[in-house]
Regions:
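Short acidic/glycine-rich loops and adjacent helix/strand connectors
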Residues: 1-126
Length: 126
């Protein structure tokens, strides 16, 4: 199964295409747009500025990740917790693509994503 992942909960816009099979999970393509330089002068992340930067970057990142790759079978997107402006950009981009491509959309909790990300490297026995 090919999954398009979208993450925009704070100050980075991240998009990745994953091949998830019984043999493992493989990153086919990934792009990240950092906002560190944008927020540096403010001493922290400014939610409104972050949201605008996500809106500017998300479509070009999705296009770049999908270029020359297989079409996704599903889309996974961070729905929270996080900064509402960034989350709205990511969720609406994911919803639009899901509708246009007629593929499933799965919401991912940001904190749970961190917890389960350790399984990318090594399967955890429960």
């Amino acid at each position: 199964m090919i999954i398009l992942g979208i993450e925009s909960s704070c100050d980075d816009t991240s998009v990745a295409l994953l091949d998830c099979s019984p043999k493992g999970h493989f990153v086919l393509s990934e792009k990240i747009a950092s906002q560190i330089d944008i927020h540096k002068k403010y001493g922290g992340v400014v939610p409104e500025i972050a949201g605008r930067a996500h809106a500017e970057k998300i479509v070009p990142l999705i296009e770049a990740v999908l270029k020359g790759q297989p079409h996704p079978d599903a889309i996974a997107v961070t729905y929270g917790p996080g900064l509402i402006t960034g989350l709205l950009v990511g969720v609406e981009a994911a919803r639009t693509l899901s509708y246009a491509l007629d593929i499933p959309l799965v919401g991912i909790n940001h904190i749970e994503g961190h917890i389960y990300s350790v399984e990318v490297e090594k399967k955890i026995e429960y």
